[in-house]
Design a protein with these regions (language model features):
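Acidic, metal-coordinating catalytic segment for phosphate/diphosphate chemistry
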Residues: 1-25
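Conserved hydrophobic/aromatic beta-strand scaffold that supports enzyme active sites
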Residues: 18, 31, 99-101, 119
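Short, solvent-exposed loop/turn segments that connect beta-strands within catalytic domains
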Residues: 22-28, 89-92
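Short, charged/polar surface micro-motifs in flexible loops or helix N-caps
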Residues: 23-25, 36-39, 48-49, 80-83, ...
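Conserved Nudix-box catalytic region and its N-terminal flanking loop in Nudix hydrolases
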Residues: 26-68
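Nudix hydrolase/Nudix homology domain
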Residues: 38-39, 107-161
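Active-site segment of metal-dependent pyrophosphate-handling enzymes
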Residues: 62, 66-107
Length: 161
């Protein structure tokens, strides 16, 4: 299924739910396995015609991570993401992704059970999002975590562990 294009961007558009919860003085992020199962990512997908972008991101969080909560109506960050590998038919496709923060209040089994939703502390999420990705895309995903922490008012802890 192809993603719709936003006229402001040359790449197809996706929406992501950056699911978090506060635990004491830090934040944890809910990540899901990619379709291939070898990498971790945020719940995301194509916008839906009858839903706002935040509503579509909220739906992705429910389907892929089994998460529900309070999603912000406006995106807090935009990043570039890739799918595929150059040696497969179709190669690599890049997407522009609008990221929406979701304060998760409840989780249940996701509709897409192979996604294995898992909570990670921010520093671990930064590492695991980068694993197996090209530097450019790894940095994009790590920046999402950093921007999310800024937005929710949680200081980033040093990775001195």
């Amino acid at each position: 299924m192809s993603s719709p294009r936003d006229s402001r961007f040359a790449l197809p558009l996706q929406v992501a739910a950056v699911c978090y919860r506060r635990v004491n003085s830090h934040a944890e992020f809910l990540l899901v396995n990619t379709n291939g199962g070898s990498k971790w990512t945020f719940p995301k997908g194509a916008p839906e015609p009858r839903l706002s972008h935040s509503q579509a991101a909220e739906r992705e969080a429910k389907e892929e991570a089994g998460a529900s909560g309070i999603i912000e109506p406006r995106h807090f960050h935009i990043y570039v993401h890739s799918k595929g590998v150059f040696w497969q038919p179709g190669g690599v496709q890049e997407y522009v992704v609008k990221a929406f923060l979701m304060d998760v209040r409840q989780t249940r089994s996701p509709e897409e059970d192979y996604r294995n939703p898992t909570w990670f502390e921010a520093e671990r999420a930064r590492v695991i999002l980068a694993k197996g990705r090209e530097v450019k895309y790894a940095h994009e995903l790590q920046t999402v975590i950093d921007r999310a922490l800024e937005h929710i008012g949680v200081a980033r802890m040093a990775a001195a562990r």
